Amino acid sequence: ICVPTPMNDDGSCDTSAVEEVISLCTCPLIILRSTVRVGFTKEMTNKYNKKIVFQPEYFGETVAHPFADLSDRSWLSFGGKQDAIDMAIEVYQSVINSNVKIYQADSDTVEMAKYMENAYLATKVIFCNEIFDICEKLGISYNRAREIWIADPRIGSSHTFVYKNERGYGGSCLPKDISSIVNQAKTVGIEPKLLEAVINKNMDYK
């Protein structure tokens, strides 16, 4: 299942389309690819008494995305009950390379890992945009500084370009996913000030 999970007005994740499809599925195993809030897969498994595995989608939105093809993936993560995960892995092993690293965990953990990825990438984009602004004021070439910076293998070059005519992050994934994890944090009494600052700064760029 890979259907949209748009952002609600309060920043939460709208999973109504996902649940509708789950309710209609009669297959022995459901692979859920859509990004959903933490706890959703477990909730649906119990509610509908179906075998559901969360195996997050990473295809991205550009033709240059490093994971645009399944054959480019070096790892896969599976979240759910063990019997369902075993069934899913058996299916995937018929199409993936034997050197692909497989990670298994409960669905809550894998759902959180997906949010961690997108929230971090959104934060990285805003960090680079702010550094770009500082470079501009100091008369420094951001791109030259960037090349030296990313030479450190700990940094990573993805999401470090800054586009003058399209500042901040956008698309259909990063905005809704960072908003969703902020919403989830607040529901359990956490004030995620860093992530909220990232969202607010991104709004300044729009």
Place the predicted regions along the sequence by residue.
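Structural/interface elements that position substrates and couple domains in central-metabolism enzymes
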Residues: I1-K206
